[in-house]
Design a protein with these regions (language model features):
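Conserved, mostly hydrophobic/aromatic
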Residues: 21, 25, 32, 71, ...
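Glycine/small-residue-rich loop that forms an oxyanion/phosphate-binding "nest" at active or ligand-binding sites
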Residues: 63, 67-68, 72-114
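Glycine-rich, proline-tolerant flexible connector loops at the mouths of alpha/beta enzymes
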Residues: 28-29, 35, 39-65, 86-89, ...
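N-terminal amphipathic alpha-helix/helix-capping segment at the start of soluble metabolic enzymes
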Residues: 1-22
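Generic structural signal for hydrophobic
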Residues: 11, 32, 71, 102-103, ...
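Short, basic, glycine/proline-bearing loop/turn elements
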Residues: 11-18, 53, 102, 106-108
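Conserved phosphate-coordination/catalytic loops
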Residues: 2, 23, 58-62
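Structural motif
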Residues: 17-20, 37-40, 78-81, 108-109
């Protein structure tokens, strides 16, 4: 069992609330780690929050990876989760390559939106 699974199982067994926060930069990740946040998400919501777009559709893997690298620099205790943005998992080969890239950059959990048209890809992953 991975450290991430062990930590999540422990949190669930203890019955405490899991504290999960979205973060996009190094300075806030330091604070979140110090105050004991359990899970930090680098989400595709950065399209709206950081880039000022109306939705998340313009977010690329490079955008996510940039913010993941900033957040991961200070990761000591929290579980790092990252979204795979739209079009980063359009087929198994693309999804696999992008998920591996996130994992190489200290991401513990890769978050992918389920849709009927990507079910087969998700099952393979």
């Amino acid at each position: 069992m991975s450290n991430t699974k062990r930590k999540l199982n422990k949190l669930l067994k203890e019955g405490d609330q899991i504290v999960w926060v979205t973060c996009y930069d190094s300075s806030f990740s330091i604070i979140l780690d110090k105050v004991g946040v359990d899970i930090v998400l680098v989400g595709d919501s950065l399209g709206m929050v950081i880039k000022g777009e109306e939705n998340t559709h313009s977010v690329t893997m490079n955008n996510i990876l940039y913010h993941v690298s900033n957040v991961a620099k200070n990761k000591k205790n929290f579980i790092l989760m990252a979204d795979m943005p739209k079009n980063s998992y359009k087929d198994f080969k693309t999804a696999s390559r992008n998920a591996k890239e996130l994992l190489k950059n200290k991401v513990d959990i890769v978050k992918i939106e389920y849709r009927d048209d990507n079910r087969e890809t998700l099952e393979k992953l």
